[in-house]
Amino acid sequence: MTRLTHIDDQGRARMVDVSDKAETVREAIAVGFVRMTPETLALAITGAGRKGDVRAVAEIAGVMAAKKTADLIPLCHPLALSKVEVSVEVAEGGLAVMARVKLKGQTGVEMEALTAVSVACLTIYDMLKAAEKGMVIETVRLVEKTGGKSGAWRAE
């Protein structure tokens, strides 16, 4: 059975001690999607929404969120990230969000990538909610990670 690393032998939550782990280059990619009507998508594409350029603001929000992950997720380590790249692209039925996060360190950046995507999606919703309250944030997930003891992993 797999042991949960954030739970000690007494069942209490704890931050994992990474001091003995090797420093390696670690990277994670996460994705998400905000489904919306064609009319709302047109507002996002043209930047004609009431709050400005939806895609640009969401990308910046995602970068900021990745840097704040340790403040939002209780047992995450504060990390000196070397790269955070967030993109918001037009796709059929909505906006596709992707975050790529990288560092050289002792712990992975999966949570930073997932946090970046989640906050970018929430920002898209916030900026367009005046036009459509029924937007759906979906499929937020990790699609790839490299580095560290467990090595590379890719979603199927």
Curated annotation (Swiss-Prot):
Complex formation: Homohexamer; trimer of dimers.
Pathway named in the protein's UniProt entry: Cofactor biosynthesis; molybdopterin biosynthesis
Domain of life: Bacteria
Gene Ontology terms, MF aspect: cyclic pyranopterin monophosphate synthase activity
UniProt family annotation: Belongs to the MoaC family.
Cross-referenced InterPro entries: MoaC, MoaC_bact/euk, MoaC_sf, MoCo_biosynth_MoaA/MoaC, Mopterin_CF_biosynth-C_dom
Residue numbers binding substrate: L75, C76, H77, M111, E112
Catalysed reactions listed for this entry: (8S)-3',8-cyclo-7,8-dihydroguanosine 5'-triphosphate = cyclic pyranopterin phosphate + diphosphate
Its biological purpose: Catalyzes the conversion of (8S)-3',8-cyclo-7,8-dihydroguanosine 5'-triphosphate to cyclic pyranopterin monophosphate (cPMP).
Keyword Lyase in record: yes
Keyword Ion transport: no
Signal peptide interval: none
Protein name: Cyclic pyranopterin monophosphate synthase
Catalytic residues of the enzyme: D126
Organism of derivation: Caulobacter sp. (strain K31)
Gene Ontology terms: biological process: Mo-molybdopterin cofactor biosynthetic process
